[in-house]
């Protein structure tokens, strides 16, 4: 079966079963350098165009007339595999390409110099344990009762470590070539001049010298090379090759340099003065043994350092009460300043950790913000009729489609790569059986109207032949290898024509793209809001307090605007304040003025009515106080001063009344109608 589907290895190698050289330089280079050419085989059952390889001279190909007679059984196995037009992919081999040398260098360099992941952690932690065990045995070799045990074991451990560190140094030097600044001999020398590389080289050379000079397996036999033992302790620096510890310490010291300098300066002044005054008080004092403990200023400085650093050896003690008083006073003052740098550094480290956490939280917001900006811009650009807005949704025609389609009409194919891979994976088919199990169908847009049912026999490719071991396909019955839902999904993907130009986009395409972009915008907005959520309780409290402060400011501003527009409520202001507030332009003051005017108009209307009634009664000659002839029981008001009209009633008054005059007194029952 396998022999029938693929040519032999020797024949494959001879007739170009591997890469297709020269394909990147056009079809001319492909025709010159490739042992076989690609011929367009037309007249298939579906009218589609397929490329089939033409074999070497004397070997019948798929288009040769002798092909059906050469192997009848092979003709029933199904269609031949399509020839890939990608020059980087082999026709008969699907093996992964070999990793490039620079790629391997980069992976090794990242593994050694930029450790990330659990594998790197395990490796570097194992190296740390080995170095720590070697250091412990080095310490035990200096103890007399463990010399015999530790020295022999240490000798072999030193040999293993020298070989290991030497090999690792060479590998590091080789893998550094993946970076542009370390390429070549001068680049390697630049890498070797790094401080940590120099330390590694010194450790390897020192260990080699110790092993070479040592005799009879004794690592530290001679006293001449015992000084090199310190260089072997430098292996502990190998643990932190990236120098993150020193960078962190340096950044903390640099940030708090002013506070550290201040405390150290004042503490140093306290040390000098306290030592000097104690020396003056104790320079002639003699202890119980008859010796002068503070015979020089250097002895006093030593006592001061031991005292202010809270060590207290007790080798020098003040003898006089004057010296003890001076020592106690200055000790309290100086010890407090010498203890401050530890607290400053501790708080600096805590702030640094918090700053890194904030930076991590902020870095998580950057991709979300970028995605939100991008989606917002795309939503805005969707309203622009420019063609560049829609080019990202247009599929570029591949080189294989350009070669397979001689006519300008586009073709549709069932071979959807992702769906095919999923179906093959679900069915558990081997690579040699995939081409037999999945039918290859090509659809022509010109005959799309006359196309029968998609699930009928005529709608499938007749090139699917039966296989005695996989499935039986006859012309009268169609055998399904997939579920109905998968066939529907496959049908939905096959009926979609790829858009190759912006002009092919229709209004429903553009509307769908706008809807998708708007949905992407809402999703990106939600993710950005989730990324901006605070991660600490203190941040939550700070955010709430800041929000409460902003809310109070807004409420006060709103209250001020309401007071300016409406005015203060009448229940909370006195009469004098109302008088003062009447001249303002608030709504309340305007309403008060309107009410005053309405009251004044009401009074004038009543006055005019009384005057008209008096004039009417005088004109008719009636007695004062008599009823009007019209009846109605209304009594006419009597004229003032014996029939004369008060002229003050006709005087116009434009002056506004006071607030106390605004209230009209209620009429009694006798003043009614």
Swiss-Prot record:
Segments on the Extracellular side according to the record's topology features: 141-151, 217-224, 282-297, 319-320
Annotated spans, Interaction with AKAP9: 587-615
GO terms (BP aspect): adrenergic receptor signaling pathway; auditory receptor cell development; cellular response to cAMP; cellular response to epinephrine stimulus; cellular response to xenobiotic stimulus; cochlea development; corticosterone secretion; detection of mechanical stimulus involved in sensory perception of sound
Topology, Cytoplasmic side: 1-118, 175-190, 241-258, 347-673
Location of this chain's protein in the cell: Cell membrane; Cytoplasmic vesicle membrane; Early endosome; Membrane raft
GO MF annotations, alphabetized: calmodulin binding; delayed rectifier potassium channel activity; outward rectifier potassium channel activity; phosphatidylinositol-4,5-bisphosphate binding; protein kinase A catalytic subunit binding; protein kinase A regulatory subunit binding; protein phosphatase 1 binding; scaffold protein binding
Transmembrane parts of this sequence: 119-140, 152-174, 191-216, 225-240, 259-281, 321-346
Keyword Phosphoprotein: yes
Catalytic activity, reaction form: K(+)(in) = K(+)(out)
Annotated membrane topology: Multi-pass membrane protein
Residues covered by region (Interaction with CALM): 368-380, 514-528
Gene Ontology CC terms: apical plasma membrane; basolateral part of cell; basolateral plasma membrane; ciliary base; cytoplasm; cytoplasmic vesicle membrane; cytosol; early endosome
Glycosylated position list: 287
Residues bearing PTM Phosphoserine: 27, 405, 407
Family matches, as PANTHER family: POTASSIUM VOLTAGE-GATED CHANNEL SUBFAMILY KQT MEMBER 1, POTASSIUM VOLTAGE-GATED CHANNEL SUBFAMILY KQT MEMBER 4
Quaternary state and interactors: Tetramer. Heterotetramer with KCNE1; targets to the membrane raft. Interacts (via C-terminus) with CALM; forms a heterooctameric structure (with 4:4 KCNQ1:CALM stoichiometry) in a calcium-independent manner. Interacts with AKAP9; targets protein kinase A (PKA) catalytic and regulatory subunits and protein phosphatase 1 (PP1) to the KCNQ1-KCNE1 complex, allowing PKA-mediated phosphorylation and increase of delayed rectifier potassium channel activity.
The protein, known as: Potassium voltage-gated channel subfamily KQT member 1
Record gene name: KCNQ1
């Amino acid at each position: 079966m396998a022999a029938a589907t693929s040519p032999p290895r020797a024949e494959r190698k001879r007739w170009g079963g591997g890469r297709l050289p020269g394909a990147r330089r056009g079809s001319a280079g492909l025709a010159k350098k490739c042992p076989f050419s690609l011929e367009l085989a037309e007249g298939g059952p579906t009218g589609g165009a397929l490329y089939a390889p033409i074999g070497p001279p004397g070997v019948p190909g798929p288009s040769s007339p002798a092909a059906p007679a050469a192997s009848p059984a092979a003709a029933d196995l199904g269609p031949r595999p399509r020839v890939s037009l990608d020059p980087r992919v082999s026709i008969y081999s699907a093996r992964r390409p070999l990793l490039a040398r620079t790629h391997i260098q980069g992976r090794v360099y990242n593994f050694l110099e930029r450790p990330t992941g659990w594998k790197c952690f395990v490796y570097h932690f194992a190296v740390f344990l080995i170095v720590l065990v070697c250091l412990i045995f080095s310490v035990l070799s200096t103890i007399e009762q463990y010399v015999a045990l530790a020295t022999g074991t240490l000798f072999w451990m030193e040999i293993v470590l020298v070989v290991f560190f030497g090999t690792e140094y060479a590998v590091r030097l080789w893998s550094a070539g993946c970076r542009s600044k370390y390429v070549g001999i001068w680049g390697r020398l630049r890498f070797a001049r790094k401080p940590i590389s120099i330390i590694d080289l010194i450790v390897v050379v020192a260990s080699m010298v110790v092993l070479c000079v040592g005799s009879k397996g004794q690592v530290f036999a001679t006293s001449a090379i015992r000084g090199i033992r310190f260089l072997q302790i430098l292996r502990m620096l190998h643990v932190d090759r990236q120098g993150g510890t020193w960078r962190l310490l340096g950044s903390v010291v640099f940030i708090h340099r002013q506070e550290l300098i201040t405390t150290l300066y004042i503490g140093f002044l306290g040390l000098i003065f306290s030592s000097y005054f104690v020396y003056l008080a104790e320079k002639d004092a003699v202890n119980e043994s008859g010796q002068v403990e503070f015979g020089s200023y250097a002895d006093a400085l030593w006592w001061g350092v031991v005292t202010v650093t809270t060590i207290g050896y007790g080798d020098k003690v003040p003898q006089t009460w004057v010296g003890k008083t001076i020592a106690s006073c200055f000790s309290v003052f100086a010890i407090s300043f010498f203890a401050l740098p530890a607290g400053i550094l501790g708080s600096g480290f805590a702030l640094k950790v918090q700053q890194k956490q904030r930076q991590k939280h902020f870095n998580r917001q950057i991709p979300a913000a970028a995605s939100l900006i991008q989606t917002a811009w795309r939503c805005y650009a969707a309203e622009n009729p420019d063609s560049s807005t829609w080019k990202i949704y247009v599929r570029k025609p591949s080189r294989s489609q350009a070669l397979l389609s001689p006519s300008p009409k586009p073709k549709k194919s069932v071979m959807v790569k992702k769906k095919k891979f999923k179906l093959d994976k679900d069915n558990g088919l081997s690579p040699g059986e995939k081409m037999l199990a999945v039918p290859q169908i090509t659809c022509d847009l010109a005959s799309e109207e006359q196309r029968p049912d998609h699930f009928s026999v005529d709608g499938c490719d007749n090139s699917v032949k039966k296989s005695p071991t996989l499935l039986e396909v006859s012309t009268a019955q169609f055998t399904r290898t997939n579920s109905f839902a998968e066939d529907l999904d496959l049908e939905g993907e096959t009926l979609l024509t790829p858009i190759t130009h912006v002009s092919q986009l229709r209004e429903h395409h553009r509307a769908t793209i706008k809807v998708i972009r708007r949905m992407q915008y809402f999703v990106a907005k939600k993710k950005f809001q989730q990324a901006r959520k605070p991660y600490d309780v203190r941040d939550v409290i700070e955010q709430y307090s800041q929000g409460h402060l902003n809310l109070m400011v807004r409420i006060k501003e709103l209250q001020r605007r309401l007071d300016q527009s409406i005015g203060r409520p009448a229940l909370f202001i006195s009469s004098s304040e109302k008088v003062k507030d009447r001249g303002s332009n608030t709504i309340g003051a305007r309403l008060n003025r309107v009410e005053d005017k309405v009251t004044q108009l009401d009074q004038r209307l009543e006055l005019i009515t009384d005057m008209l009634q008096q004039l009417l009664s005088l004109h008719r000659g009636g007695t004062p106080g008599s009823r009007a002839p019209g009846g109605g029981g209304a009594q006419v008001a009597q004229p003032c001063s014996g029939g004369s009209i008060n002229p003050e009633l006709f005087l116009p008054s434009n002056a506004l009344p006071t607030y106390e005059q605004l209230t009209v007194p209620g009429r009694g029952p006798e003043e009614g109608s």
